[in-house]
Curated annotation (Swiss-Prot):
This is General odorant-binding protein 99a. Keywords: Disulfide bond, Olfaction, Secreted, Sensory transduction, Signal, Transport. InterPro entries: PBP/GOBP, PBP_GOBP_sf. It is found in: Secreted. Gene3D superfamilies: Pheromone/general odorant binding protein domain (1.10.238.20). Disulfide bonds join C33-C64, C60-C116, C105-C125. SMART domains: PhBP. Belongs to the PBP/GOBP family. Residues 1-16 form the signal peptide.
Length: 142
């Protein structure tokens, strides 16, 4: 039992560093990445519709946004704990099935892809499997 409590405390401490972002943060990160990468208007319009074509500019845009969110790091990849916390909020119960579905979308880049391709690969899976939850977490608050 003590081991279980210790593990729970460690998980809590590890995820305590992440601050859940809001819609304002998302819009700011999008704008920053569009400017940093000189993303053309036609692609920005697609991104606003949650459409992310598989091209180099979009891949690097995805990496940029997920990095700014604290959800992706070029050395270690996706942080599933942070993604889970972002989608369910700070005070939600930790749902193991949902966590496992998120973890299934990420890899350790065994393929040796560049960071942009790696981020895109994981993000497109996360979007495909969890779009409604992602949109809900970023919806304007009434």
């Amino acid at each position: 039992m003590k081991v279980f409590v210790a593990i729970c405390v460690l998980i809590g401490l590890a995820s305590a560093d992440y601050v859940v972002k809001n819609r304002h943060d998302m819009l700011a990160y999008r704008d920053e990445c569009v400017k940093e990468l000189a993303v053309p208007v036609d692609l920005v319009e697609k991104y606003q519709k949650w459409e992310y074509p598989n091209d180099a500019k979009t891949q690097c845009y995805i990496k940029c946004v997920f990095t700014k969110w604290g959800l992706f790091d070029v050395q270690s990849g996706f942080n599933v704990e942070n993604i889970h916390q972002q989608l369910v909020g700070n005070h939600a119960d930790h749902n193991e099935a949902f966590h496992a579905s998120l973890a299934a979308c990420v890899d350790k880049n065994e393929q040796g892809s560049n960071a942009c391709e790696w981020a895109y690969r994981g993000a497109t899976c996360l979007l495909k499997e969890n779009l409604a939850q992602i949109q809900k977490s970023l919806a304007p608050k009434a």
